[in-house]
Regions:
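ABC family nucleotide-binding domain
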Residues: 5-226
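C-terminal boundary and immediately downstream tail of ABC-type ATPase nucleotide-binding domains
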Residues: 223, 227-248
Length: 248
C-alpha cells in the first residue's frame, strides 16, 4: 500500500562493545513482504545488527521501530516482540533434550496459548513444509546439521512471526547441506515472508533478495536491488569485497 509505514525501521542506531563501535548511525527500513540480504566482511556488524532487532543486543542510542512502535525493553511486551520476530541462528539453538516436535510446539503453547493438539497439528504441517516430517520424534543430535536448521526454521514459522531474522544460517553447515536450507529459505521468500538475512551466500542474495545491504566497519555503505549491486557496486569497498567472494 502506497504510503504505508515500513514493518521495521532503524534510525541512527549505535552499539558499542566497550571501546569498539560496532554499529555507527545505522539507518535501515524493511517493508512487509520484503527480503533484505545483508552482506559484508566478517566483523562488519552484520550479526550485531540482526541481534538488535529483537533485543538480544540492546542498543546504546537511536531508535528501532517494529510496526511503528519502539522495541520494548523488558517484560511481557518484550516476549510479545520476540514472538513476532522469529530468529534462525547459525548454531540452530534447538533444545537438545526435547524432540523435534517438542521444539516446534513449545513456543506456540507457552507464548501464543495454543492447545497442544493444535500446536502439534501445525508443527507437523511445518515440518512437512521444510522436508523433515519423518524426523518429528527424534532428538536434534540424531539429525544432520541441515535437518536441524530446517527444524529451526519450522520452529520460527510456528510462532507466525511478522519478520524472520536469519543470522548466517548456513555457515555452520557442511557444504552439501547448504542448498537444502537455502531451498527452504527461497521458498519462504517467494511466499512473501518478510526476511532479513545475514549471509555469505551470494547465489541466494542474487536470486531471492529484493534488496542487498552492504556493511563494513559498522556502517551501511550501500543499498541496492541485487541486480544493481552485483553488476555495478558504487563504493570501492563493495567492489573489493565482491572481487574476493565471487569466483569468475
Amino acid at each position: 500500500m502506497v504510503g504505508a509505514s515500513p514493518l521495521l525501521r532503524m534510525e541512527r542506531v549505535n552499539k558499542w562493545f566497550g571501546d569498539l563501535h560496532v554499529l555507527k548511525d545505522v539507518g535501515l527500513s524493511v517493508d512487509a513482504g520484503e527480503v533484505v540480504v545483508v552482506l559484508g566482511p566478517s566483523g562488519s556488524g552484520k550479526s550485531t545488527l540482526c541481534r538488535t532487532i529483537n533485543r538480544l543486543e540492546p542498543i546504546d542510542s537511536g531508535t528501532i521501530l517494529l510496526d511503528s512502535r519502539p522495541l520494548p525493553s523488558e517484560g511481557r511486551e518484550l516476549a510479545r516482540l520476540r514472538s513476532d520476530v522469529g530468529m534462525v541462528f547459525q548454531q540452530f539453538n534447538l533444545f537438545a533434550h526435547k524432540s523435534v516436535l517438542e521444539n516446534v510446539t513449545l513456543g506456540p503453547v507457552r507464548v501464543r496459548g495454543l492447545s497442544r493438539r493444535d500446536a502439534e497439528t501445525r508443527a507437523r504441517e511445518l515440518l512437512a513444509r521444510v522436508g523433515v516430517e519423518d524426523q518429528a520424534s527424534k532428538l536434534p543430535a540424531q539429525l544432520s546439521g541441515g535437518q536441524q536448521q530446517r527444524v529451526a526454521i519450522a520452529r520460527a514459522l510456528a510462532m507466525e512471526p511478522k519478520l524472520i531474522l536469519f543470522d548466517e544460517p548456513t555457515s555452520a553447515l557442511d557444504p552439501e547441506m547448504v542448498q537444502e536450507v537455502l531451498d527452504v529459505m527461497t521458498g519462504l521468500a517467494r511466499e512473501g515472508m518478510t526476511m532479513l538475512v545475514v549471509t555469505h551466500e551470494m547465489g541466494f542474495a542474487r536470486s531471492a533478495a529484493n534488496r542487498v545491504v552492504f556493511m563494513d566497519h559498522g556502517q551501511i555503505l550501500e543499498q541496492a536491488p541485487p541486480e544493481d549491486f552485483f553488476a555495478s557496486p558504487t563504493t570501492g569497498r563493495a567492489k573489493d569485497f565482491l572481487s574476493k567472494v565471487i569466483r569468475h
